[in-house]
Amino acid sequence: IFFIGFISFLVLSRTIADLQARERQETTQTIPNSNTPKKTTTASSSSKKEEDINPELVGRPIIDISGWQLPSEIDYDVLSQNVGGVIVRVHSGAQAKKENAATYLNGLDKSFKTHIQEFQKRNIPVAVYAYVAAKDKKEMEKEAEEFYKAASPYKPTYYWLDVEEKTMKDMNAGVEAFRAKLQALGAKNIGLYIGTYFMEEHSISTDKFTALWIPTYGFDDGYYNAAPDTNTEYDLHQYTSQGQLNGFSHYLDLNQIAPTQDQEAIYRKLFKVQKDNSSS
């Protein structure tokens, strides 16, 4: 009996050992070795596409500035944290009769280079604008050339024409001469800044511009009060000249993408940073 019991014990022990060995083998096959490269899912071509805008900037205020906002009074590090884009004045138009604190006698803004460079190196997209004030078509074309020559090396995301006053009999023809010359020089993204009343009074056509920027202030108390009173589709709304943002101790013009528009789509349209010369 003892012998039979001993044999049974050996057989049972062998069976248990075999089962434990099999379990270890299965476990080894199930759990990857730490030295074995992990399998990764390859991203689709669409998800691999490099983001052409910073989504964090989309909801922030957009400012427009000139030489009247002195670089020495701006903390670019702080202000850059509070804006989604900047539109910098490059040319002040032919109305400059003498040099002043913000403008050279030739019409070029004294601070445009500094403004553009300081915001761009902080990854804030920059567009540019010129105040349109020539007295005839020939002068309009000359201003367009000066504007493009000064701005294009910085590859701005957009070129804007700021039209606020009547400086020639047919302002629509003058504005078109400026726009057409700018386009002929190589600018592809060209927008128009204009008040709705002036646009209607002087029959300024927006058809050939690729974006429209309209000022409507309401109470002009630093906050959004009212949308532009127009049936014309617009992209950007300048809603106050009394805005205040950390990084600059004086008032700023504040702008927002039209509330009726797709915010990200319009932001991408106006502030997509070009990696080639497609905007310039």
Task: Describe each PLM feature range.
Residues 1-14:
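Hydrophobic membrane-insertion alpha-helices, especially the h-region
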Residues 12, 16-19, 267-271:
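Extended hydrophobic/Leu-rich segments
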Residues 16-59:
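N-terminal, intrinsically disordered, polar/charged segments of Gram-positive cell-envelope systems
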Residues 43, 47-76, 210-280:
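Functionally critical loop-and-helix segments that line ligand-binding/catalytic clefts
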Residues 52-179, 183-185:
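Substrate-binding cleft of extracellular glycoside hydrolase catalytic domains
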Residues 93, 134, 197-198, 244:
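Positions that flank functional sites
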Residues 131, 193-195, 239:
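Conserved beta-strand termini and adjacent loop/short-helix elements that scaffold enzyme active sites
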Residues 158-227:
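Catalytic domains of cell-wall/extracellular-matrix polysaccharide-remodeling enzymes
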